[in-house]
Amino acid sequence: MLYCLSSRKLEIKMYKFKTKPYEHQKDALKKCWDKESFAIFAEMGTGKTKIALDNACILYNRGKIDRLLVVAPKGAYMTWVEQEISAHIPDYIEKEVLAWKLSTSQKYKEQLKLIRSVNDFRLKIFVMNVEALST
């Protein structure tokens, strides 16, 4: 569990991790959990994905976000969908995950509408590759 103390409201928040974080990941979360914006500059393999997902879950639990956009390199973005999200987001958080693809099918269009729709109390996660921004 991570206990965070907000200096503005002196509220203690509790978050139950799905996967146990290392100390440096806890330290990063303590620095970013209540910020409007932040960046994670860390070496490859240090758990930036876990930090980002845990932070998104903390914000979701606090009612600060209801959607998450993940932009990753083409060779890595499907790893978020196939492995990382289910590995790190706690099971008690209901979520809807959609990966970007170049498709005109009616089913995919309906899924896109769902991701963009009003909040139905699920964390909506849209994952895309950075190269798609240039197409």
Model-derived features: where do they sit?
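SF2 helicase/translocase NTPase motor core
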Residues: L2-I40, T46-T135
